[in-house]
Amino acid sequence: MRTFEITEKEVAAAFREAESGEAKKILAALFCKEEMVKPTLDDYKTIRTYEDACKALGEPIFEDPNNLPNHIIALMKLETISRALWGRNFQPKPDGEGSKVYWYPWFALWTQKEVEDMNPEQRGALLSADANGGATAGFGSLHAYSRSSLAGADFGFRLCQETEEKAKYFGQQFIELWAEYLKFNFTVGNRLK
């Protein structure tokens, strides 16, 4: 087995010359400290924090002079991150004809065991039932009409992504922000602490 000696300067030059996002990821994984991978609108996986999203978009980091509620600040940050994850060329537009598919981020704030260990009042507040359009609340909402179940996406378009992969990344990479945005008066699962 041969050993190669590569200087940091050579790695930096190779990184600048790499044309594909995949090549840059490989170089970064092999040679770079995590901080050296700069956030870019060309590769959504370089957006790892809210600050990365601001940097990639060229926007200032939000400072709250008005003491807004934490869930509002979290939503504002999620919207910024969503725009950064869309990338440079993607401009989502609502599609009234339904010809486009957008993916809402998915994640789990509680494990199955944590839900099972909740008392009935906590579980009832977490998962609600529908009173025919009058009482949908909580994080999950159960519907029963002409079929045994119905799934619906009634809100949150600006947080959607154009691929399932990006939506999964958005939900899991930024799970703490999602928890802050959605938890209201709940304590989220222990694994997020």
Predicted regions and their residues:
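Charge-rich, low-complexity N-terminal segments
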Residues: 1-77
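Short intrinsically disordered terminal tails
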Residues: 1-2, 188-193
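Acidic, glycine-rich loop-and-strand cores that form catalytic or ligand-binding grooves
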Residues: 65-122
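Short aromatic-glycine-(Arg/Gly/Cys) micro-motifs in beta-strand/loop hairpins
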Residues: 99-108, 113-156
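A short, charged, amphipathic alpha-helix used as a generic interaction element across diverse proteins
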Residues: 162-177
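ADP-ribosyltransferase catalytic core
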Residues: 174-187
